[in-house]
From Swiss-Prot:
The keyword Metal-binding applies. Mn(2+) 2 binds at D285, D296, E471. Pfam families: AMP_N, Peptidase_M24. Binds 2 manganese ions per subunit. This is Probable Xaa-Pro aminopeptidase BDBG_08406. Mn(2+) 1 binds at D296, E433, E471. It comes from Blastomyces gilchristii (strain SLH14081) (Blastomyces dermatitidis). GO terms for biological process: proteolysis. Its cofactor is Mn(2+). The lineage of its organism: Eukaryota, Fungi, Dikarya, Ascomycota, Pezizomycotina.
Amino acid sequence: MISAIEPKNLLRPHSQPVVTTSTLQPDDECNIELRIEDTTVDKYPAKQHARRVAAEIHRDRGLVYLMGQKSTLYEDSDQERTFRQRRYFFYMSGVDEPDCDLTYDINADKLTLYVPDFDLKRTIWMGPTLGREEALQRFDIDEVKYQSSLDEDVKQWAQNQGRGSTLYLLHESQKPAEKVPNVFIDSKTLKQAMDTSRAIKDEHEIGLIRRANEVSAAAHIDVLRGIRKMSNERDIEASFLNTSVSLGAHKQAYHIIAASGSNAATLHYSKNNEPLKGRQFVCLDAGAEWNCYASDVTRTFPMTSQWPSAEAKHIYKLVEHMQESCMVRVKEGVRYLDLHILAHRSLIRGFLTLGIFKGGTLEEIQNSGASNLFFPHGLGHHIGLEVHDVSPESIMAQDNGDYSDNVLISPNNLSPCTTSSPTLKSGMVVTIEPGIYFSQIALDNAKPEQVKYVDLELVKTYMPVGGVRIEDDILVTKTGYENLTTAPKGDGMLEIIRQGDGSCNI
């Protein structure tokens, strides 16, 4: 039985649809209800974020200067590029509009947004740009001014502060258009401060990630309900996009991966154009975006409500076990790297049972790196404003900041060098996404010390499985975790396929 989390006190954009999914009983259909609520919403906490960043800068004076994304045209074209706001700018503004900039005066605790000056021609063609009164009403900003005053305002700030004042930039290339005299340009401190701040999500951010996951769950369910009448990978992509957009999520957090059969062994497969006939599994890695916040959800499923082969079922159940054994250990203070190692050890045990690995102990096979042939990526990553979100250091890093596949699963190297590897903290949102892939290219290029433990003849019977990945978005708490992803998996997933409409085209 599957139940989706009912939205509770979510922070919703004004007049956006609310996604609800009903609890599934054995003979029920999965019903998606679309409800529009027109309510006053808490503003995105830009000022709170600015203060957090300032605290990480560890200075009581200075001016943070952030540039938003500009409107640009495609090369040799009069068509505008699809707009995507700079995520660092959004974090301190909440503004998803083009051609804006902002400053934050640390000493005065003043956040100022600069919006485009009025342009009659653009307004006639494209509609009005963000205005001062609208911006003050919508965003958590102290003052809104026009772009034409930005350079002069920065110069005036520098003059008032006196010689030696600091202007904090993300990048050297984002300096003000006009030179600002008598200021020190610091393009190193701000990024580290913002990365540290962004790694821990507040309640508003968690609400947005939760909402993105609710939309994604609805889209994944619609794919499951319709998969029996789909004939091509593009049908899966189209279904996911259709549901997402209809529920108010006009953007995807990343390019949809709808990989069937052996295509699923390509981690970031993107063509999505091959027929489904004769394929055992589809690996659908797809997540909607909500108000610039990402979801990242992967489900692997057959084209019918039955496991297509004993091998397919064995691998799915093994990946399911890998994920569950890692998730139950998530809480503040746990080293994520240890969870990754646990996933590899679970894979090795499973492969020894199935006979895919042979001729060695668990430790010998782990030390050889043989499991990397079938699980070549990390267990997961931060998620937030980016699908692979920022942090002061990678959760997969060792104490020297390095990440190496060969070193990663070798206890001889791990034991002495990872005592200070980063630990999970309450408020982080990370993915748990183990996978098993049968890639002929990986096997053909394997090192002798790896492949000697692999029964290559037996592996041939598993090649049609392609790849299996299961991925959820996990909120770390002080005592455990909350799974923000409500898309069904396992037996519940098969039940939805069984109840789905349409006859099987496979």
